[in-house]
Regions:
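Conserved beta-strand scaffold positions in the cores of enzyme catalytic domains, especially
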Residues: 18, 96, 155-157
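Short amphipathic alpha-helical segments and helix-helix/interface helices
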Residues: 6, 58, 84, 140-147
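Conserved phosphate-donor/acceptor-positioning beta-strand/loop module used by diverse small-molecule
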Residues: 89-111
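"Short basic amphipathic alpha-helical interaction patches in structured regions
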Residues: 8-9, 83-86, 110
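Conserved GTP-binding G-domain of TRAFAC-class P-loop NTPases and closely related GTPase folds
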Residues: 108-184
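Conserved nucleotide-sensing/catalytic segment adjacent to the nucleotide-binding pocket
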Residues: 14-90, 127
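Conserved nucleotide-binding/hydrolysis micro-motifs of P-loop NTPases
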Residues: 24-25, 75-76, 100-105, 162-164
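Glycine-rich phosphate-binding P-loop
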Residues: 1-11
Length: 184
């Protein structure tokens, strides 16, 4: 779902770069040791430099005027709003796309991603129950806040397969649109 959505957005922009903090996490100097010692907490234990790396990369890309997709969990609207303002001040046009996936499909995706990495000899990434629940539940609030703060005039809610999308331009529409796509 996420990869397909990001690729579709990049194509519609005429190409660009995607920033995914989970990919940057794999560059952590202790990632191999962390993954061996506690693979189910790898995301938490490797957080240290990842936020700073992500911020530095975003700043560099903005300064170099690249088209960019910033993958995010939609967990913290205030950070997203501030970053959008930074891009707009630099002359960018910003938009927000939220992926709405049924909860069980989302959880199964975590398990499948982890198993595929282990079977492929790669570094597995697990998302904790708390992290998943917070991000999954928080997306509705974040979309509502982005709209009510005036960060963006609209947010596109997209289904996992990209076959459905709903353009939301009012905070009151956000929860219903996300629920509709998740349940359809």
């Amino acid at each position: 779902g996420k990869s397909r959505t990001i690729n579709n957005v990049l194509k519609s922009m005429g190409d660009g770069l995607a920033i995914d903090s989970d990919e940057l996490r794999l560059l952590h100097p202790d990632i191999a040791r962390i993954s061996q010692l506690d693979p189910l907490r790898m995301d938490v234990l490797s957080n240290g430099p990842v936020g700073e790396w992500t911020k530095a990369l975003i700043t560099h890309i903005r300064e170099q005027r690249f088209n960019v997709v910033i993958e995010n969990t939609f967990a913290r609207s205030e950070i997203m709003a501030a970053e959008a303002k930074n891009f707009e001040r630099a002359g960018y046009q910003c938009s927000f796309i939220a992926l709405a996936v049924p909860e069980l499909v989302s959880r199964l995706g975590i398990v499948n991603r982890y198993r595929a990495a282990v079977q492929g000899g790669n570094i597995p990434r697990w998302t904790s129950e708390v992290s998943h629940t917070n991000a999954y539940a928080g997306i509705k609030t974040t979309v509502q806040e982005l709209l009510s703060l005036g960060t963006t005039p609209e947010v596109t809610i997209v289904s996992r397969f990209g076959d459905q999308n709903i353009l939301v331009d009012s905070p009151d529409q956000a929860a219903d649109a996300i629920t509709h796509i998740r349940e359809d």
